[in-house]
Amino acid sequence: MKEPEINVGIVNALEIAFTLNAKFLAKGETVSGKQRVSFDEGGISWNGNVYRELTFTPLEDDASFSLEDVTIGINFHWERQETQTFLGTLRLVVDEGKITAINQVPAEDYLTSVISSEMNATSSLEFLKAHAVISRSWLLAQIEKRKALSKQGSNFFPFLKTETEYIRWYDREDHTIFDVCADDHCQRYQGIT
């Protein structure tokens, strides 16, 4: 079985500044260094053109990119912004009047970051292994759920009502253009930062 590629929503803003720390391919040209995109005319403005979507594909396996002003701890007392660095592909997509930065990365690379972002390095090896199993299982369940929802279209109802119960699922419908987000809402993912 081929390792799945995970689409992780990192940041959503009117303007996104980032640095390509190696050579990437975008719109048929090789680019690197500091970049800035902004939401304009319903699209993504970059280098004098407006696009509906932009993809920056690394030309080397260990190529990374750094996103500025990534908010972590959303709605927690320790919420703050920081620059984070990621491996893999950077996709920029228009969503709800803003630009969403999505990191496309192999599942095991994603999980390595999740474990190191959520756990203390001094935790026991068995505890870290158990966390990896839980995180992997949860991730694969989210991917399967997203596939099922896309097949159903708008027929998904995030609640179940019986005579004695009303069950409401929160958050599954929150992510429609990526598999999981990078914050505590899903699993904390901070790239290789």
Q: Where do the model's predicted regions map?
A:
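Conserved, single-site charged/polar hotspot
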Residues: M1-T193
